[in-house]
Amino acid sequence: MAAALARLGLRPVKLVRVQFCPFEKNVESTRTFLQTVSSEKVRATNLNCSVIADVRHDGSEPCVDVLFGDGYRLIMRGAHLTTQEMLSALASHIRDRNAAAASAPGADKVAPGTSTRR
């Protein structure tokens, strides 16, 4: 898990929402994922990224919802995933988003719904 933590950077991530019921038996990996993502070392990679813990007592399935800056959304159902699987999936999507941002010209990039007229 240390290797996944070392390469985890939240630069392209806008929001991480972790939702779980603490009284269910299958939430340990989701809670560990939340601890990892909300650590100071990981949070320092993007100070504009919000990490939200949504703790409910409704018996709901643990869920991790990651919103990237380009509008892409990653939803992981944590009931049958290990912490390592969730971290490696997030790291893989972050690498893909970084590669997509690097290949697109930065000056010509316009957010959807905006115009370039001044």
Swiss-Prot record:
It comes from Mus musculus. Belongs to the mitochondrion-specific ribosomal protein mL53 family. Residues 99-118 are annotated as: Disordered. This is Large ribosomal subunit protein mL53. The lineage of its organism: Eukaryota, Metazoa, Chordata, Craniata, Vertebrata. GO terms for biological process: mitochondrial translation. Its main location: mitochondrion. It is found in: Mitochondrion. It holds the Pfam family MRP_L53. InterPro entries: mtLSU_mL53, Ribosomal_mL53.
